[in-house]
Amino acid sequence: MVIFEKTRGKNSPSVMPSKKGDVSNIPANMLRSKKPILPEQAELDVVRHYTQLSRKNFCIDTNFYPLGSCTMKYNPRAAHKYASLAGFLERHPYASAQSVQGTLECLYDLQNLIKELTGMTGVSLAPMAGAQGEFAGVAMIKAYHHKRGDFERDEIIVPDAAHGTNPATAKVCGLKVIEIPTKKDGDIDIEALDKVLGPKTAGIMLTNPSTVGVFERNIAVIAKKVHEAGGLLYYDGANLNAIMGKARPGDMGFDVLHMNLHKTFATPHGGGGPGAGPVAVNDKLKEFLPVPMVGKKADKFVWLEEKDVPNTIGRLSAFNGNIGVLIRAYIYGAMLGGNGLTEASKIATLNANYMMARLKQEGFTIAYPERRASHEFIVTLKPEFQNYGVTATDFAKCLIDRGVHAPTMYFPLLVPECLLIEPTETENVDSMEKFIQAMVEIRDIAKKDPQYLKGAPYNLPARRLDDVKAAKELDIVWQPK
């Protein structure tokens, strides 16, 4: 029940009278024609309502959250604590650079940390989400070709195992998407790549490790072929958590990338924001980076604006990015340091391989059994579907009943009835074993009573929602009747 429905028409809480202001200068079409619909609740009732809702939330602070490709790692409280210091929290966006030197120094150091981590030479922290960073990266590729007069380069190559945002970003930037297949071993089909490379190629968008959870072994060959064709390589940083300190996109031949700080650098995840998706580039694309950036002149830190970067693709938003998120990322990086970030990647990889081996041991089917998991892996429940009629969705709903968030379902699309599982480095063996035992228990139930799975979840206030109705009849301005 939403708060509007609880006591409407029953209670009329008193409010302090307010003096009516002059509204004569407000256009008539901007004035309300009727009173707003507001919940009628006392303060205590409101507190109880939202406290009860919070207890129904599922989050990384309450339970294991192995959502593949999302890197649901713990957000350290120290980062929140120090990012909430008055000097950071109370800084006004219009404050002069001279008055916020401490904040700018943190951002400057974060830019340098990202350069070192990725093997790139230029960084902008301006994008306010991973998707916006992705847009900025492809926009820079387009700007690069246009400056060279290569206006015919309007094709972006995207593997079929790519993130769904990749083709969407290319489309938003006015480019055509050319899809190529992934082979049965998880690597890109090089022969298919050769067939689509040509004078219209603007670039290729890759995630490495890929969304099927394996490292692209032919990345050096791919980079050479794309560059020889005149294209550029875009690195989707969604899976960067798997390789920190072990491999760098710049060294693989990538020209531009975006990072998801809510994944790699453990900033708050989900809830609609705020987010941060920094972009990093090599020398080819530095002149196109979005502004503002933080620079250093003499011993002072400064904002670099359009006048300092004349070929920039421009601003992506008002002000200077989501600095509260960026500060949290800086603190996370400072706490771990280079060795700590490398260790985090090692443990993330170890955890993924442990879970993959254990589930294989328990008789589940691994999508790419001959490959090592980089940080996540895929279980296909196709045998369970064929033998018992239960689906990946049924397993997912039953997992929620057992206090474990479901892994990513049906993604990537090329693996049938799949669960994409990513434990991250912040989980211990007990948490992972709880998940494994839950999977075994659910399969045992499926053998005896598959209809039980069809009715799950049983322990939540909402059970199976009508996904089609929600998509077809979207209501984002709901009001009580």
Curated annotation (Swiss-Prot):
GO terms for biological process: glycine decarboxylation via glycine cleavage system. The modification N6-(pyridoxal phosphate)lysine is found at K263. Its cofactor is pyridoxal 5'-phosphate. Keywords: Oxidoreductase, Pyridoxal phosphate. SUPFAM superfamilies: PLP-dependent transferases (SSF53383). It is an enzyme of class 1 (oxidoreductase). It catalyses: N(6)-[(R)-lipoyl]-L-lysyl-[glycine-cleavage complex H protein] + glycine + H(+) = N(6)-[(R)-S(8)-aminomethyldihydrolipoyl]-L-lysyl-[glycine-cleavage complex H protein] + CO2. Its EC number is 1.4.4.2. InterPro entries: GcvPB, GDC-P_C, GDC-P_N, GDC_P, PyrdxlP-dep_Trfase, PyrdxlP-dep_Trfase_major, PyrdxlP-dep_Trfase_small. Residues 1-23 are annotated as: Disordered. It comes from the Bacteria. It holds the Pfam family GDC-P. GO terms for molecular function: glycine binding; glycine dehydrogenase (decarboxylating) activity; pyridoxal phosphate binding. Signal peptide: none annotated. GO terms for cellular component: cytosol; glycine cleavage complex. The keyword Oxidoreductase applies. The glycine cleavage system is composed of four proteins: P, T, L and H. In this organism, the P 'protein' is a heterodimer of two subunits. The glycine cleavage system catalyzes the degradation of glycine. The P protein binds the alpha-amino group of glycine through its pyridoxal phosphate cofactor; CO(2) is released and the remaining methylamine moiety is then transferred to the lipoamide cofactor of the H protein. HAMAP family: GcvPB. This is Probable glycine dehydrogenase (decarboxylating) subunit 2. The lineage of its organism: Bacteria, Pseudomonadati, Pseudomonadota, Gammaproteobacteria, Thiotrichales.
